[in-house]
Each structure stands twice: as C-alpha cells, then as structure tokens.
C-alpha cells in the first residue's frame, strides 16, 4: 500500500509497471514496502530457512523483504494490486527505526536476501 512520510508529508506508492516483472525482481527497486497484504496460503509457501540467517536465527532487520520478495515472485503481476490510497504513516522521526539504529545490519541483510535464489511463479494460488 501507499504511505506518507512524517514529517515531510511525502507520499510513497509502489511504482510497478508490466516490465518490472521481467527478469529477477529481487535485483530491481524495492517496491513492496509497508502494508503489504497477502494470502496465508502464499505466505506458507515461503521456506522457513529464508526467514533466517546462517546461524538459524530469524532476521533482526529487513524481514519485510524476506517475506515479500518470495511472495511477489510466486504471485506475479496477475495477483498483484498496488493501492494508491495512503494507509500508513511512516514516522521518520523515530530514533529506534532500523535504518537509524541498525543501518549496517539492514544493508547487509538486504544484500543476502536479494542474492537468494528467486522463487518460481506459481501456476495457481
């Protein structure tokens, strides 16, 4: 869904066109941010190990990408709908947000997740 950044009031919406889905979407811009919704059955198809680091611990940061990349890959454009309506306020003033408090871990985790093998598109959901 779309969200508004506090305090700038900038509205952020997914920017996904037909060509976005060509190739490996993990290597493209991150568009599946806050307020992603999905079917439980799709979520259950994501391998548990893809939510974890090499030590078997769940990701401390960047879990949104660990969740959304595989589901977007499996669902494809036929089962994706961007919501332009603002549904979320993203508080950029929060000093505890991961990109402020744990930025290096966030960037490292993102690279690991982006380099994982993409999931295959499902025929049916």
Model-derived regions, located:
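Acidic donor-binding loop at a coil-to-helix junction in glycosyltransferase catalytic cores
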Residues: 58-67
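Short helix/loop segment immediately N-terminal to the Walker
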Residues: 48-59
